[in-house]
Amino acid sequence: MPILRSAHSLPHKVIIKEGINMLKSQEVRKLAPEMDPLRMGMGWKEEDLTKPQILIESTYGQSHPGSAHLLNLAQEASRGAYEAGGKGALYFATDICDGMAQGHDGINYSLPSRDIIADLVEIHANATTFDGGVFLASCDKSVPALLMAIGRINIPAVFVTGGVMDAGPDLLTLEQIGKYSAMYERGEITEEQFTYYKHHACPSCGACSFMGTASTMQIMAESLGLMLPGTALMPATCEDLSVAAEEAGKTAVALAKKGMKASDIVTLKSFENAIMVHAAISGSTNTLMHLPAIAHEFSIPLDADTFDRMHRGAHYLLNIRPAGEWPAQYFYYAGGVPRIMEEIKDHLHLDVMTVTGKTLGENLEDLKKNGFYEKCDTYLKKTGLKRTDIIRSFDDPIGTNGAIAILRGNIAPDGAVVKHSAVPKEMHKALLKARPFNCEEDAIHAILTHQIQPGDAVIIRYEGPRGSGMPEMFYTTEAISSDPELSASIALLTDGRFSGASKGPAIGHISPEAAQGGPIALIEENDLIEIDIPQRILRVVGINGEKCSEEEVQRVFNERRKALPPFKSRYTHGVLKRFTQTAHSPMQGGYMD
């Protein structure tokens, strides 16, 4: 006689009927008699119909190097699921590439694409019932999109990231192309040199080999507990990644049989762990939009102030580009996420659950015993570097105040984001003259034609979520950071966002944005801008070049607001119309209703 268990002991939607614990897919199968013949029409065997059904969702497509190789990994995950007694079904939600969208209006689709991919995965998962899933992605919007979808559909889930591409000749990496483009525009390198750099910056598949948004979000996926330990940001060309994908398929079946949902793993403590790791790696500022958006799907409150609080006093350890010296493929060689966590484990919640069915603390102990670090060392030896050349020890950090700060003031009442670890020390406190522009194109032109001088604050507005979809200001930051005269003497302020490859004095996500009447819309030429990163201040302290009181600034702002024309979106149909009408503040995650 089978033993009946209480439904409350089954965290997944397991239906108890006639003494048998029935997976949801099997119950729905009885309600939809067409399901079996349709699956048999795809070549399924009769015994496959009764197995745990595993969604194998990837962003595979010939869209960019981060996704072009994911089909092989998805097939490995499906093979693993089959070997563990499940049946995988491959689904695809191809992503776009921010790099290919740069320099034209295509970049306006970047952030909206995150939400659209999450929607498509929700449709895939819920239109055909699955008992668990393996989710595969590599890059800026695809990783957070699938993590958002996991939170929304809340099934047993394992994440596999597509790893990182190799560096090119002389350790050339893609984020340097923006710098070389600006140098070419200024006549500092030849066309032949520029062409060589372009043709050799991406020698393999995988995410771009620097600590940009793609690499950061791969690390965040593991930090949340949804990946097998040590599998984030592996070299995309190594066999270890295929093995990890196969193992993920097996793990997804095990989680489905246990009924362990994603929400049983991802908690507020998980997000706090991810933020501490983010501080240690000096991760992309875009994480401040992606993690809150993911947390929203898990019904967990998370705001930008949590990042600011946790980054204060956090030790920054990672010597990887763009803030550091080495390409991102070396991160795995040095021990990857587990090595970072080992260094900061006194500041982590080690009792959080992970997809292994063990706690984070147990996983870290297992890795010390199973040869993981020794295997990483075999890769590292080929570089001639030591582990501490890549990941510093907690007692010998690169910095001791994290990487991110949230600034506030009469320009950004709801906040603005700066990666202070990438800002020259002389710009941590500055008084600058405002040079406002209503689009990025005009600002870039002014910089490249030497209209911007030391002591200026370049302000780019109407580029927030409600303005234009919140594109990246990558070329502007590269034009500034590659100019020796400007890189440590001016600042960029915007309600838009930055590429994870950006460096230099760049302050973004200014909220409220100009399109919603935020004070950034009221700034005029030669207003005086005060930046004080240690005190977390961003404000106008003078009008037309003359310092004045806060009350006088507010009086002038009130007068200017009366003359400010209402914002009119240029998008009248399609995705960008929907996004710019419904997107939330970047301080809340910039997600679309």
Language-model regions, residue ranges each:
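Position-driven detector of the extreme protein N-terminus
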Residues: 2-4
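Short, Lys/Arg-enriched N-terminal segments with co-localized hydrophobic residues
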Residues: 7-21
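Catalytic or ion-coupling anion/metal-binding cores of large enzyme and transporter domains
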Residues: 19-66, 73-93, 99, 105-110, ...
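Glycine-rich, highly charged phosphate/nucleotide-binding loops
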Residues: 110-119
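A short, small-residue-rich loop immediately preceding and capping a beta-strand
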Residues: 125-146, 157-161
